Amino acid sequence: MKTEDMALVFSKLILNPITKRQILNLFKKDDNGNLIIENYIDAYMKGEDINSLGYKTLKSVLDNGLKTFAGEIYKENFKDFLKDPLFKKGLISVVRGLGYFGVKRPFVSGAPFLVVWDVTYACNLRCKHCYANAGKPLEDELNTEEALKTIDILANSGVVAIAFSGGEPLMRKDLFELIDRAKDYNMQVSIASNGTMLNKTNAKKLKEHKVDFVQISLDGTKETHEKFRGIKGIYDKTIEGIKNVVDEDIFCAIATTATKLNYRDVPKVMDLAEELNVNYFMLYNYIPVGVGDYDIDLSPEEREELLNLLWEKLNNDTGKKYRTAFLSTAPYYSRTALEHNKYYLASHFANVDLGENERLKSLANFIGGCGCGRFYLSLRANGDIQPCVFFPLKLGNIKSFKDENDFLEFWRNNKILNDLRDRDKLKICGSCMYKYVCGGCRARAYSYYDDYLREDPGCILTKNLK
């Protein structure tokens, strides 16, 4: 049976009212306050059998999902993956998403996998492209009590990962208290920093508090970076910060936002990323928002040149055993891979090579493209909720939610989020053959046209679709 036909059968299984009801019942709590699904996944992992309709439903969903999208060969590996608490959290969110939304293209998780939270707008730099217009903290930024409650709500909703950003998050005095609260819930915690405050002491402290991932911004050579960031003398501090994080063996990424001011420097930064032995080089898709001007945005041709360069670097078989992976937040990066006859889920979460497995390849249509409103949300420092940090459209405020039930109700039913999840609603990108693996950047559409369903003007294909 073809994968598309198997996916249809799987979808019918999920849409069965009895199946759907049993899936949602898995998210009730037992007498110990644990989700029933957590107990059942533990039993599934151990190969145990439980005589209950809920367990049999979960087992059927997992077995049929694996068969449809991976094949039986992956079943035993899958059980090994379940030993990882983060993988287990992610799976629980997937199952909840099936109960809420069914087998959608693109897929929507039961709660955001990732929330990017600008915990403060205090910053020691003056970057020319800052989406947050950072510098001084807002007067109404969440206090410690409000921030801790926010983490409780997100964690209890099933959010897997939280990224503390800004501003410069290290300028928030209670940051490590917030990190500890998130780690108490076994959440993945990352920090997005400009690197200038990452001295040996702070890098060691991040390690001690079990931060999983640190992303540091670097936008070019010394001259370019300091011009871009608005302060002379900070390039060396940034490089030192990167080295300190790598020395602490924390997963480290260099993030470069490509504009007309620095895109010729990008290959040099990519080479430097390898020399510094970081795990990721992340090419950020520039979006004119905050203090960022439209006139420094790349043309579609310049952006295409960079994405192809990134792809070549990722697949360069020179015999060198660098560990650096090359990623981009541009949703068209997956389309770049397909144009090179490769099935790759290329995103700002990870690069996933789907290889030659036809069933795995079909996943690209379900989980590829922009995750905005499907896999992640953003929070401003005052608790305002946005689809993405580059997408300044207020959807609500976290302080208005009493608990995780209110948050999950918002996640399920917010009109704008549901618009973003429906690629058939896209006015130009919706007619593109790559709409499921890409779909364009909704933040760029909103920035340019004040309409998040319009085309992404940064994509080289849009001129042929009008």
From Swiss-Prot:
NCBIfam families: rSAM_more_4Fe4S (TIGR04085). Residues 100-317 form the Radical SAM core domain. It comes from Methanothermococcus okinawensis (strain DSM 14208 / JCM 11175 / IH1). It catalyses: GDGT-0 + AH2 + 2 S-adenosyl-L-methionine = GMGT-0 + 2 5'-deoxyadenosine + 2 L-methionine + A + 2 H(+). It comes from the Archaea. This is GMGT synthase. CDD domains: Radical_SAM, SPASM_MftC-like. GO terms for biological process: heme biosynthetic process; lipid metabolic process. Its cofactor is [4Fe-4S] cluster. It holds the Pfam family Radical_SAM. The lineage of its organism: Archaea, Methanobacteriati, Methanobacteriota, Methanomada group, Methanococci. The keyword Oxidoreductase applies. [4Fe-4S] cluster 3 binds at residues 429, 432, 438, 459. Changing residue 123 to A: Contains only the 4Fe-4S cluster 2. Contains only the 4Fe-4S cluster 3. The analysis of metagenomes from both oceans and lakes suggests that GMGTs producers are widespread in a variety of oxygen-deficient environments but absent in oxic environments. [4Fe-4S] cluster 1 binds at residues 123, 127, 130. S-adenosyl-L-methionine binds at residues 167, 217, 229.
